[in-house]
Swiss-Prot record:
E.C. number: 4.2.1.19
Compartments where located: Cytoplasm
Protein name: Imidazoleglycerol-phosphate dehydratase
Organism: Chloroflexus aggregans (strain MD-66 / DSM 9485)
Catalytic activity of the protein: D-erythro-1-(imidazol-4-yl)glycerol 3-phosphate = 3-(imidazol-4-yl)-2-oxopropyl phosphate + H2O
EC class of the enzyme, as a word: lyase
Length: 205
């Protein structure tokens, strides 16, 4: 496996390149963006969800992924989310001055989702969601929890996600991705009251 990571010091931006025997992914994330997204993974529903994540989080996100979709979507979807988490971690730098913790409730028609995050450097993921169908488009619903876990663990943050209720699996997943974007938007913002200090009594994240 070959990985090359580069960060741009003049902005909270990172590019991650990941190449394995199964996939090739190039992903660029700008935290302080405007919600622009250009996603091409070969998995239409994943493209849609990441576009929503960027739009509602006001992140700029570009993804180019090529994977062994003749096998299934698992490797490609997983590696894209690994890269997304690593890009977020790298773009945040020391995390000095950020709000750090935030949450968001997002409805999508009959479905309601909650996502809470803590960018404190301790990776964890709790997902509570039940899906009635095995797939939405080209993406298996059994992968949804694993994708959020991949983002959280590689992004070094704590993520709790819950679908409180709903009937349509597309709506449930869409609400989750929107809520995740909005929670991360709030948590990554600078709080001027911190004066650029680390938001932890330990002095390091």
């Amino acid at each position: 496996m070959n990985e090359a990571n580069s960060a741009m010091s003049d902005a909270r931006r990172a590019t991650i390149e990941r190449t394995t025997g199964e996939t090739s992914v190039t992903l660029t994330l700008t935290i302080d963006g405007s919600g622009r997204a250009d996603i091409q993974t070969g998995i239409g529903f994943l493209d849609h969800m990441l576009t929503l994540w960027a739009k509602h989080g006001l992140f700029d996100l570009t993804v180019r992924a090529h994977g062994d979709l003749h096998v299934d979507e698992h490797h490609t979807a997983e590696d894209v989310c690994i890269c997304l988490g690593r890009a977020l971690d790298q773009a945040l730098g020391t995390r000095a001055g950020i709000v750090r913790t935030a949450h968001s409730f997002v409805p999508m028609d009959e479905a309601l989702a909650l996502v809470a995050v803590d960018l404190g450097g301790r990776p964890y993921c709790v997902m509570q969601a039940e899906f009635a169908t095995p797939r939405v488009g080209q993406l298996g619903t059994d992968l949804i929890g694993h994708l959020f876990e991949s983002i959280a663990f590689n992004g070094r943050f704590n993520l709790h996600a819950q679908v409180l209720y709903g009937r349509n699996d597309h709506h449930k997943i869409e609400a989750l991705f929107k809520a995740c974007g909005r929670a991360l938007d709030a948590a990554t913002r600078y709080d001027p009251r911190l004066g650029g200090t680390i938001p932890s009594t330990k002095g390091v994240l």
